[in-house]
């Protein structure tokens, strides 16, 4: 086992604080509408330019192991806030730095760290209640666009695209962000259920100009296994031909004799038919086939359920108004499934989302939910250079999370004002002793820091602005750093999602409290490089 280096009390906290400062100082320059860029070197390709706090935080690794511990703890604040709320990472970092700085001073002055932590917790609890009480639910499209614009560092085009996407696919719908190959940013909305499997054979194509299959009012056969022989399917195919409707086959695979026969029949014009592979793998494939069955009002043909292919009747097949299949995707529009069945299925998926601990599973479940409940919107972000596209894509991702958070818990005045106004609530917090009161005061000073930093980044005097704001009693009256004016921020469209502000404060206080109550640090001692032996001189 490697030898360890151990640091105690003030020495330990000072080292950690240095790391916290290095990371937070690099992140906080990005805060606000006039936040600056940070350029990050990449081991290959052009450097990356970003205004996204968590991206900067994730890139910072310090040489000194004890300083690095402090930096990594604050990086954890940014990552956690990004995971929960999707935005507010810079605010969380700035708050954490302020709480740790003030807390370390108090501990050095001889106060009890555990009482300080208790005071911090009481203050945060009171502020969270105040934020929830003042949060305003958002209903209009304009408000959603405003949230998106603010989170995208004032880019109104991004805000407009997000509002349009959310209007079209609903709050449950999936909105994905991709890099475009052109200069323009565009929005594409896929109505109905889409999955990433194209036609098995190009011979099924009905629209040769666009190279895609279009089936109007088709029957849909959902089969769990491979189809290689057609003998067992003949009774069903005859029934479909007599009905005069097209048929879509969704199966694990269609191969050999089955595929050849279907293609020949399609080319001769006797049978309007197309086949696609089932989406997903393993258990997820079963679940997705079940989703398709519920959406189209059909039954999954599975050996597990004791249903054999030769016994399948038309009533077991799904129906849809239209199916469009291209080389890569299949879209089922307006499935004939019963509304109550679809709602029951979406409720079941929501429960699974709440219970799962895996981020990957959660993402896949949310995709399935969106396909059943709403639709899918794709925002393709354009730009003149690759660096610009990447930077814009970062901002669109941030803005997307922020708008979702705003719909969930409502909005507050932006510009750090909601936290600043919460200083009044702290006057009523009851504490058991002087050290706990000092903990409350640490938060009182820390929640002024975001406003100061936003103003400072805009080139004005932070202390002066904070003083002016505290003189005036109106909750949403604040300083608009983008224009340099004092005004009602909600009316001016400078708004923050309540969830983002709340999460930033809670995460910052949680990690900062841990740093304040730290008394020892343990790290591996750096290994001394062994010098190579000199070559023998026997010549």
UniProtKB/Swiss-Prot annotation:
The keyword Isomerase applies. The keyword Chaperone applies. Its EC number is 5.6.1.7. It is an enzyme of class 5 (isomerase). ATP binds at residues 30-33, 51, 87-91, 415, 480-482, 496. PROSITE patterns: CHAPERONINS_CPN60. GO terms for biological process: protein refolding. One of its GO terms (molecular function) is isomerase activity. Keywords: ATP-binding, Chaperone, Cytoplasm, Isomerase, Nucleotide-binding. Disulfide bonds: none annotated. Forms a cylinder of 14 subunits composed of two heptameric rings stacked back-to-back. Interacts with the co-chaperonin GroES. Belongs to the chaperonin (HSP60) family. HAMAP family: CH60. PANTHER family: 60 KDA HEAT SHOCK PROTEIN, MITOCHONDRIAL. This is Chaperonin GroEL 1. It comes from Bradyrhizobium sp. (strain ORS 278).
